[in-house]
Amino acid sequence: MRKSLLIIGLTTIACLTPAHSESGMGWVSYPGGEGPGKGKHVVLLAGDEEYRSEEAMPMLAKILSQHHGFKCTVLFSADPDGTINPNLGTSLGQPEALASADAIVMSLRFRKWADEAMKYFDDAIQRGIPVIALRTSTHAFQLPPTSGFKHYNQFGKKVLGESWVTHWGKHKAEATRGVIESANRENPLLRGVTDVFGDSDVYEAYPPADAVILLRGQVLKGMNPADPAADHEKTRATDKQKQGVNDPMMPVAWTREVKNSSDKTNKILCTTMGAATDLASEGLRRLVVNGVFWGLGLEIPVKAEVTPVGEFVPSKYSFDAFKKGTQAADYEPAK
């Protein structure tokens, strides 16, 4: 993996036909087709202020749609005129798309959706559909006390397996190398997953005993894939004891199967990686795609196709650094 992946665009080998993509106020949809995902609808939720989920989710949606046959709909936070605005935490475009979701891929942070939008999300969860959750989704919601769904403020801890704790690696200074958990290296979710790297930092995280750890995050001394492992000490937030920052390494990807209040089971894949720049890593993209297959009970390919459809040049993560004036239609393939 080379740093140049973050600088140059990644393009597909073949030219794919985008004839039936659609978009509207705060949403874009890509058609399903032939492939293992035929007849399945994946809804991807983009809504965080820092890590450019509004760029990452359309890229993942196009991979799932064009390479694997899933119908995919991306829902954004947007201003009333449809301009994408990740800072508008109360907004979710076309939440009714969740009514037909077979799986959710989410990259959210402190959303404050109205009860009408939360009802669609809650209904989807209660149906027992799988959830693939990235980065700040551990703290996806910050609903007000008046919300009928305020219990979702605990969604990270109770469902995904962890909430926000703190940055474990130094933010914007120590990148992450994904290290496969040796005890679970034969897990089907790890098929084709190699050389995972992200230039976002490791989060402090302690998933519960029922979680199956897939990857741990090695904190690096710098921001490049070839940098050596960091060797300083860090104080844990939980018990205030010091440990080597990589001894042990924090989990950065795990699965759970969680029974909800409707007595249905949600299959969960959570990763604390997932900035748009992290998803320049082929291995991390493949883990997310494998998660969709696993969640839906589909056979996970030996090496799933995860080449971006068209150009993918992820913006560097930072608050208020989103591309101004962008509409959902801008994420439709060129016609």
Feature-to-residue mapping (PLM):
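Helical hinge/lid and interdomain linker segments adjacent to catalytic or ligand-binding clefts
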Residues: 28-30, 34, 43-45, 49-140
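An acidic, glycine-rich "communication" segment
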Residues: 38-39, 134-233, 304-335
